[in-house]
């Protein structure tokens, strides 16, 4: 953690990477790249592309906005969720599974919302900020919802893989209908995290 803290200080001091909208207080988990940061990022991407192109991957660039139907078919609408809990007093939100792991040192991955809620109540886990009681655990979908046009429901893609899957047939026939072949994509994906990272790592 000390090394990460030192790297962060250097990045801030030299304007390599810094919080978005910093002069207005910023927003947790969002960062801008200065010139050096952008060059480092571009070099990493160039090396990744070089590696995959040498392995004969086909590169695509898909839309970052996809219709609701894509995520209904993939299961993201129902299962791309985190269990969250709200403090009754200070109104802070927390990842319920993280609270349990920190307090009880047990993993709850795969457990239902009801099971996670029961564990919190039985072990009297309180708000880490003010030590008050917590509300019931609920599901929080990690995708950013959009309206395209007047009423078309869509989402920012939470992973770059969606475009590869939905474009597979088009790419397959466009490149001679021969197997095997591989597709790659470098781009942005979007997740509405309850506890965003404090830095890039």
How does the language model describe each region?
Residues 2-201:
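TRNA-recognition modules of translation machinery and tRNA-sensing kinases, especially anticodon-binding
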């Amino acid at each position: 953690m000390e090394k990460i803290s030192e790297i962060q200080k250097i990045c801030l001091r030299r304007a390599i990477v810094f919080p978005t909208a910093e002069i207005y207080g910023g927003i947790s988990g969002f960062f801008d790249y200065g010139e050096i940061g952008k060059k480092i990022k571009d070099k990493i991407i160039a090396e990744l592309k070089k590696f995959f192109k040498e392995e004969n991957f086909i590169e695509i660039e898909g839309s970052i906005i996809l219709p609701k139907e894509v995520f209904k078919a993939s299961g993201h609408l129902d299962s791309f969720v985190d269990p969250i809990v709200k403090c009754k007093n200070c109104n802070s939100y927390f990842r319920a599974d993280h609270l349990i792991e920190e307090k009880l040192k047990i993993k709850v991955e795969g457990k239902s919302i009801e099971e996670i809620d029961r564990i919190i109540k039985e072990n009297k886990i309180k708000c880490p900020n003010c030590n008050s009681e917590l509300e019931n655990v609920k599901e929080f979908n990690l995708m950013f919802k959009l309206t395209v046009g007047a009423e078309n429901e869509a989402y920012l893609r939470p992973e770059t893989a969606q475009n590869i899957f939905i474009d597979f047939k088009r790419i397959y026939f466009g490149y001679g209908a021969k197997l095997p072949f591989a597709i790659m994509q470098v781009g942005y994906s979007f997740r509405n995290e309850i506890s965003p990272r404090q830095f890039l790592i």
